[in-house]
């Protein structure tokens, strides 16, 4: 984060501390009966890095939990101080089954979180968000190797893989070079260190979405939404830098979480531009959630900037996790909480806090109706 961004963040946090935000709306409208969400715990040991949770949304009661961690193969040493292999990433509810991504495997559960099996492959490396299709396949964003890979859910076979760093047009547009990779090998534990992610060509492809028979990817290292099928940059916007999650509505409207800007951003893919921003700090419920953590965050952040500490700092209101149910958006934040926002009005209509530990963040979200 540069000095100007840090100064603006400090001003925003001062506003959060000093002023009240907008109240919750009175009417909640139609809500799903159940949600599933995954958590990631910053700087935790691998075995304590996160879990999959099923929540009765109406009653705000947790009905089942399951720890999520990389196993078979297990990770004995994670060189990333934040915990690169930790927790439960993207999740999807598909045909009566919950799919939950660990670092290199899709864990498969029933609605009560009884484990039904796994799907893993040598090209599943640093998984983030996933997308299921009506054809019975699942796309995974294999972030560590900048690939989008499709698998058949019934057989586990690989259907196809898209490699944006190898597409000539994207190489010219974004200045990319292919990743040195043996695609036939088991790469699941070969990219734990920072070398590949520090490369200038690294895209950090962390979300995939299928729309009009095309596959789109969020490449946040280059602040871009990319048509992976045709190899074209559809949108470039500063809000995409470091962003997470990608939903595309039938009309071509794309939604993503501006993780550091603490907002949900809306893009018109046809016009290639941002058309709306929903600032999550406008809501008083959110301000009350993060106020207790802001003073300690800045104390630790100043110490880190001064070189007095080197460990990772958990940021209040780190935005991850996004799904849609009718006119409502469900947005995940830290400390691990879920916001229900009326898409048409921008009002906060409901919310739920799972943990007050600022290190715990929601990552994946799925409606189970």
Model regions and ranges:
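Surface loop/turn motifs at the tips and blade-to-blade linkers of beta-strand repeat domains
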Residues: 66-70, 79-83, 118-123, 162-165, ...
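Short loop/turn segments that connect beta-strands within beta-propeller blades
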Residues: 57-59, 110-114, 152-156, 228-231, ...
């Amino acid at each position: 984060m540069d000095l100007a961004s840090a100064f603006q963040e400090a001003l925003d946090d001062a506003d959060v501390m000093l002023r009240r935000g907008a109240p919750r709306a009175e009417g909640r409208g139609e809500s799903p009966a159940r949600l599933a969400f995954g958590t990631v715990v910053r700087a935790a040991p691998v075995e304590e890095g996160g879990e999959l949770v099923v929540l009765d949304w109406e009653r705000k009661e947790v009905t089942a939990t399951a720890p999520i961690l990389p196993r078979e193969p297990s990770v004995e040493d994670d060189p990333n101080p934040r915990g690169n292999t930790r927790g439960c990433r993207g999740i999807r509810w598909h045909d009566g089954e919950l799919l939950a991504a660990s670092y290199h495997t899709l864990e498969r559960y029933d609605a009560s979180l009884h484990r039904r099996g796994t799907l893993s492959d040598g090209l599943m490396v640093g998984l983030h968000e996933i997308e299921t299709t009506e054809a019975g396949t699942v796309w995974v964003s294999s972030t560590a190797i900048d690939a989008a890979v499709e698998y058949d859910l019934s057989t586990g076979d690989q259907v196809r893989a898209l490699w944006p760093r190898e597409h000539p047009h994207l190489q010219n547009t974004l200045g990319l070079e292919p990743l040195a990779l043996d695609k036939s090998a088991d790469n699941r534990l070969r990219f734990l260190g920072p070398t590949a992610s520090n490369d200038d060509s690294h895209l950090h492809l962390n979300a995939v979405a299928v729309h009009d028979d095309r596959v789109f990817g969020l490449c946040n290292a280059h602040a871009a939404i990319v048509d992976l099928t045709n190899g074209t940059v559809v949108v470039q916007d500063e809000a995409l830098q470091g962003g997470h999650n990608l939903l595309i509505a039938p009309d071509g409207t794309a939604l993503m979480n501006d993780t550091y800007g603490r907002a949900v951003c809306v893009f018109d893919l046809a016009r290639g531009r941002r058309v709306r921003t929903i600032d999550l700090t406008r809501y008083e419920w959110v301000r009350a959630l993060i106020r207790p953590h802001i003073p300690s965050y800045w104390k630790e952040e100043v110490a880190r900037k001064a070189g007095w500490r080197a460990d990772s700092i958990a940021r209040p209101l780190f935005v991850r996790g996004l799904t849609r149910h009718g006119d409502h958006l469900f947005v995940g934040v830290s400390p691990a909480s879920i916001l229900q926002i009326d898409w048409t009005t921008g009002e906060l209509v409901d919310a739920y806090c799972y943990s007050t530990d600022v290190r715990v963040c929601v990552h994946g979200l799925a409606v189970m109706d």
